[in-house]
Design a protein with these regions (language model features):
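Flexible loop/turn segments at secondary-structure boundaries
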Residues: 15, 52-53, 216-218, 335
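Conserved NAD(P)H cofactor-binding loop of Rossmann-fold oxidoreductase domains
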Residues: 10
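C-terminal substrate-recognition regions of SAM-dependent nucleic acid methyltransferases
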Residues: 80-242, 246-301, 305-312, 319-322
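Hydrophobic beta-strand segment of the Class I
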Residues: 6-7
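Short amphipathic alpha-helical surface patches that mediate protein-protein
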Residues: 48, 265, 330-333
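S-adenosyl-L-methionine
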Residues: 1
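Short, amphipathic C-terminal "tail helix"
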Residues: 323-335
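Conserved Class I SAM-dependent methyltransferase catalytic core
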Residues: 14-82, 94-98, 260
């Protein structure tokens, strides 16, 4: 049997278990894969957009989709309610047109805030898909001028081996190797020997941030703006953290840690992180477009300036034009 066209709104996920902390396994990718295997003339399906940059178990599917030159068009809705008014789907939704005879760039249309922007795109330009057409020129400038990105030093989840629910003792132990454990709740105390990962960071000055984004999987506030990063903090020597946080950097001097913390507060950095987000959790890969800086006193950035002034220095350093500056300033909240 031959199909000329396959059209569908496949089931998005299968929930595993009955407890509130259980999760869903994506299903829509399997329907898309089967449809492509059938090889009709056309396929069009609407799915969550989370596959652009993340999603549990979607890495292989994402690479397959980004490398598929038969995808003629994608129509993306950052806010799923623009497509389904009564349904909130984290990361938005999108539908695509697959054409067996098409073998060139994809016409990608992004819908956001009542506006639509269309651009011919090479889907596999990066190992994730940047849904914001307006951000591409800035990303190209930054990558052309940068040897190392910040993701190279961001810790993976559970940086010291303690899950989010783990708690140590309420009071410090008499053992001199006792260190403080920061969690999303109150601080507690653990022995150094209980730290199973990254012991080399324990005695350094660290910058940590919450693994959860401030927004609901990339959904803006009512003004169309984002904060992106929620909790940011300095973690002193002899302090570690649970899985609730990731470590952005660990330094021998407090000055470098302070300057990294300031850098993460800039609109420039948070705008670049935003381009990788379609889910609520942050990971090292979300910092793939953020250039690593010199955080010492020898830096070409004056870190003693205000965050607003540092943003201006970064705009100058990376040749950010007025249109790009306006987009950043209007998209990202002050922090």
């Amino acid at each position: 049997m031959k199909f000329d066209a396959i059209i569908g709104n496949p089931p998005y996920q299968m929930n595993i278990g009955e407890k509130k902390d259980n999760y869903g396994i994506p299903l829509y990718n399997q329907f898309v894969d089967i449809a492509r295997q059938i090889r009709p003339q056309f396929i069009t399906m609407i799915t969550p957009s989370r596959w652009f940059t993340g999603g549990r178990g979607l890495d292989q599917f994402r690479q397959s989709m980004l490398g598929d030159t038969h995808i003629r068009a994608i129509f993306d809705y950052v806010d799923s309610k623009d497509c389904f008014p009564t349904v909130d789907i984290s990361g938005g939704v999108s539908y695509f047109l697959w054409d067996a005879k098409h073998k060139t760039n994809c016409q990608f249309t992004n819908h956001f805030g009542g506006n639509a922007n269309t651009l011919p795109r090479k889907l596999d330009e990066f190992n994730i898909f940047v849904r914001n057409n307006g951000a591409l020129s800035l990303i190209h400038k930054v990558k052309a001028m940068s040897k190392t990105m910040l993701n190279a030093q961001i810790s993976p989840q559970t940086p010291f081996g303690f899950v989010s629910t783990y708690r140590g003792t309420a009071q410090p132990e008499t053992d001199p190797t006792c260190v403080m454990l920061k969690s999303s709740g109150d601080a507690s105390y653990v022995l150094r020997e209980d730290i199973k990962k990254n012991q080399q960071w324990v005695d350094l000055h660290k910058v940590i941030f919450s693994k959860a984004t401030c927004e609901h999987a990339g959904t803006p506030d009512r003004n169309g703006q984002y904060r992106v990063l929620s909790a940011l903090a300095l973690l002193q020597p002899q302090c570690v953290c649970t899985q609730s946080y990731l470590v952005a950097g660990a330094y021998t001097t407090a000055e470098e840690a302070d300057n990294l913390l300031t850098y993460l507060k800039t609109k420039f950095v948070r705008y670049l992180i935003l381009q990788t987000i379609t889910s609520q959790d942050l990971s090292p890969e979300k910092f793939m477009f953020v250039p690593l800086q010199d955080f010492t006193s020898k830096s070409d950035i004056n870190w003693s300036a205000t965050v607003e002034e540092i943003d201006k220095q970064l705009y100058e350093k990376y040749g950010v034009d007025e249109a790009e500056r306006s987009l950043i300033e209007n998209t990202i909240k002050e922090m």
